[in-house]
């Protein structure tokens, strides 16, 4: 009747919009468009505030950057540079199909390789940094957050790459490294592989 939901286990509740925003990791506008499409309702072209448009544009760019990074890591895994990473996965009995299905990859030993690749694709430093893929400091300059690691893309329930987990090859520390929280990645709200469970 009220068209609301409530979970007695975790206390989450709301309406259809908040459900999609929580469960699907949609923005309000994405939830609205999804529901309108599903109901066959045509939405008028809306006027966004400048801030809302900038935020939506930034989210879209961060998703693009993460997708490009995941593709790059996968290609690296399949190249001669990624032999150590591929061997790691093969020792754990992961098939080529599993590696492909989960988009597993490898970040090689060069500490600015992904950065140079993303720059060649036209992405700006500030956006690559906002995606959590590089670090910038006065002493070392710009360097990749992940290098010499097997890579596990973290996807939202819509299979969009929102972050990464990496396991180092060798004895370096930290052994495991995850993306920092970003505009599109909230560690507490995402579970690795959930997109595959749907």
Task: Enumerate the language-model features and the residues they cover.
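Short, basic/aromatic recognition patches
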Residues: 119-147, 196-198
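A residue-level signal for beta-strand positions that form part of recognition/binding surfaces
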Residues: 4, 161, 174
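Short acidic-glycine loop/turn motifs at beta-strand connectors
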Residues: 1, 155-158, 172
């Amino acid at each position: 009747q009220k068209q609301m939901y409530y979970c007695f286990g975790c206390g989450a509740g709301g309406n259809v919009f908040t459900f999609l925003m929580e469960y699907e990791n949609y923005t309000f506008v994405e939830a609205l468009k999804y529901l309108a499409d599903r109901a066959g309702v045509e939405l008028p072209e809306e006027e966004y505030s400048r801030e809302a448009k900038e935020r939506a544009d930034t989210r879209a760019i961060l998703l693009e950057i993460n997708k490009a990074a995941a593709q790059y890591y996968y290609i690296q895994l399949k190249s001669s540079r990624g032999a150590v990473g591929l061997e790691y996965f093969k020792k754990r009995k992961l098939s080529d199909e599993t590696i492909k299905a989960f988009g597993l990859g490898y970040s090689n030993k060069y500490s600015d390789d992904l950065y140079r690749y993303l720059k060649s694709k036209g992405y700006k430093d500030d956006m690559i940094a906002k995606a959590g893929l590089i670090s910038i400091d006065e002493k070392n300059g710009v360097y990749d957050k992940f290098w010499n690691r097997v890579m596990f893309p973290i996807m939202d329930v819509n299979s969009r790459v929102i972050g990464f987990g990496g396991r180092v090859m060798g004895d370096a520390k930290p052994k495991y490294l995850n993306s920092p929280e970003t505009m599109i990645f909230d560690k507490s709200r995402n579970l690795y592989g959930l997109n595959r469970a749907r």
